[in-house]
């Protein structure tokens, strides 16, 4: 399966195009079929406000256009601003999936599945209210078992994170939401902030509600993590 943005109408940026899933079914050493289908989110055919009247985000308003994963028997189309959308093996959209009501914020488009435990690790960000970032963990059966806040000083754009055998790594970097720009409609509201700083957060996987240790780094921005692993008493993070 492949997911990506496909604008249906003129737009300022193709990243905001609606998600389209492309699939190839392999059987007996042959491709039995290829098909592509829109991810028909609640906002695909209807106008859904991005924010609710109380200022919280409408998590069902989604383009679901960035990634697609399979975990615990469910196939999920992802975009970091919204809830995941479940699709079938025939690429039909089932609907928004909130882990049986336990997920109350967005889900990153770059979750990590532990190859040893089968756990799904992910986070959500984007709320203008605290906590701005929340870490989540679902077990191998798909039950959401952990929701905990990640303390960051402002609404940072945390696009990706990293997972090692023993740790979860968070990237608190200086691309930050600017509410004034958003209210005035002056383009992309996430901007570089010279005063914000940059740091990496380290959380032990065996103590998921424990302290997150923060380490200051040179200001930068990381879109994607390539690899991360534990190396004796150190942690190695490779990113772009």
Where are the language model's segments positioned?
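Beta-propeller domains
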Residues: 1-240
